[in-house]
């Protein structure tokens, strides 16, 4: 259950919600089958297709040393018609 980090709500992510596609960042070591099984089990939905791509880490400098943050993977999950995932938002207090 540690595979999915958080949902992504960019312009493209919001546009894809109309096509029943959900975008989220996942652990870079997770496989498609692990994420598909976890989404179907946790949310009770049927996954039709999954697309993924790896995003590069950003460069970070600490004095003369140049480093970088960890890279991560972004998954676009397409659900079968009739299924949906409730919004994943934190409540504001």
Curated annotation (Swiss-Prot):
It comes from Oenothera elata subsp. hookeri. It is found in: Plastid, Chloroplast. One of its GO terms (biological process) is translation. Binds to 23S rRNA. Its main location: plastid. It comes from the Eukaryota. GO terms for molecular function: mRNA binding; rRNA binding; structural constituent of ribosome. Signal peptide: none annotated. InterPro entries: Nucleotide-bd_a/b_plait_sf, Ribosomal_uL23-like, Ribosomal_uL23/eL15/eS24_sf, Ribosomal_uL23_CS. This is Large ribosomal subunit protein uL23cz/uL23cy. Part of the 50S ribosomal subunit. Belongs to the universal ribosomal protein uL23 family. GO terms for cellular component: chloroplast; ribonucleoprotein complex; ribosome. Pfam families: Ribosomal_L23 (PF00276). Keywords: Chloroplast, Plastid, Ribonucleoprotein, Ribosomal protein, RNA-binding, rRNA-binding.
